[in-house]
Amino acid sequence: MDTNKTIMVVDDNPDIITIVKTILEGKGYTVLSASSGPELLNMLKGQKPDLIILDIMMPEMDGLEVLSRLKAVADTSTLPVILLTAKVQYEDVLGGYKLGADYYITKPFTSTQLVNGINLLLGEGKS
């Protein structure tokens, strides 16, 4: 699948960024990355991705705070956000959705889970 969509991956673990980037670039996406919430928010001043994949457990500013800030600003409130996290408790998932997450994937994850979530949100059909 060739696409001109851009996806931003935000995770403090460079290995996760590399894995996600490899999967998505293989599907034709342009992938940008940030290693923290503040870095993402700064990058969004100059460019808007089509979708954000966001870790929850990060230093400085956790992903839920980042999500809240994204959803509170008109410019970014409609950006689809997938939470990709090791937080697996029902309360964590529910909390993510209540703050405006569009999809929730727990680690460890498969490429199929990731691509299907993106396809669902970007209307790209099946992988």
Question: Predicted regions span which residues?
Answer:
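Receiver (REC) domain active-site loop signature in two-component systems and cognate sites
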Residues: 58
